[in-house]
Curated annotation (Swiss-Prot):
The organism of origin for this protein: Homo sapiens (Human)
Disease per UniProt entry: Retinitis pigmentosa 82 with or without situs inversus: An autosomal recessive disorder characterized by variable association of retinitis pigmentosa with situs inversus. Retinitis pigmentosa is characterized by retinal pigment deposits visible on fundus examination and primary loss of rod photoreceptor cells followed by secondary loss of cone photoreceptors. Patients typically have night vision blindness and loss of midperipheral visual field. As their condition progresses, they lose their far peripheral visual field and eventually central vision as well.
Gene Ontology terms: cellular component: centrosome; ciliary basal body; cytosol; midbody; mitochondrial intermembrane space; mitochondrial matrix; nucleoplasm; spindle
Gene3D superfamilies in alphabetical order: ADP-ribosylation factor-like 2-binding protein, domain
Binding partners and assembly: Found in a complex with ARL2BP, ARL2 and SLC25A6. Found in a complex with ARL2, ARL2BP and SLC25A4. Interacts with STAT2, STAT3 and STAT4. Interacts with GTP-bound ARL2 and ARL3; the complex ARL2-ARL2BP as well as ARL2BP alone, binds to SLC25A4. Interaction with ARL2 may be required for targeting to cilia basal body. Interacts with STAT3; interaction is enhanced with ARL2.
Name under which the protein is recorded: ADP-ribosylation factor-like protein 2-binding protein
Cytoplasm listed as a keyword: yes
Location(s) in or outside the cell: Cytoplasm; Mitochondrion intermembrane space; Cytoplasm, Cytoskeleton, Microtubule organizing center, Centrosome; Nucleus
Length: 163
């Protein structure tokens, strides 16, 4: 095999694995946006959000909650992916994800990060608690809507685009 054939083979192999990765990420987006998943996650967070406090020290109760979350949510996502891709392997995907993390939409990556990064998991709960208690980020007072069109001296009923 000459060098050109080797490059071609590597390119087609890379493209196939990239296509598989992209397909999994697409399915993940569908699963995470699905009402069933949203309800599953919301019910779990409703059950435990009052346990979480915005302090440096972590309570002992956080560990079993984190483990239960991983078991429940990761298992659900893996089952959903296996229905769509029978040969799916979560461990292999997680490894591939580390190499492609810059290519994955932020919300998907953040969600997956909550399975492996305790601080991301805790932050998710703190954000949820703040939202439930009405302490969420409110940008409404800083928003101003400005028309991008020039105002016209014609009444609105006569201000039609002319082609």
């Amino acid at each position: 095999m000459d060098a050109l054939e080797g490059e071609s083979f590597a390119l087609s192999f890379s493209s196939a694995s990239d296509a598989e990765f992209d397909a999994v990420v697409g399915y993940l987006e569908d699963i995470i946006m699905d009402d069933e998943f949203q309800l599953l996650q919301r019910n779990f967070m409703d059950k435990y959000y009052l346990e979480f406090e915005d302090t440096e020290e972590n309570k002992l109760i956080y560990t079993p909650i984190f483990n239960e979350y991983i078991s429940l949510v990761e298992k659900y996502i893996e089952e959903q992916l296996l229905q769509r891709i029978p040969e799916f392997n979560m461990a292999a995907f997680t490894t591939t994800l580390q190499h492609h993390k810059d290519e994955v939409a932020g919300d998907i990556f953040d969600m997956l990060l909550t399975f492996t990064d305790f601080l991301a998991f805790k932050e998710m709960f703190l954000d949820y608690r703040a939202e439930k208690e009405g302490r969420g980020l409110d940008l409404s007072s800083g928003l101003v809507v400005t028309s991008l069109c020039k105002s016209s001296s014609l009444p609105a009923s006569q201000n039609n685009l002319r082609h």
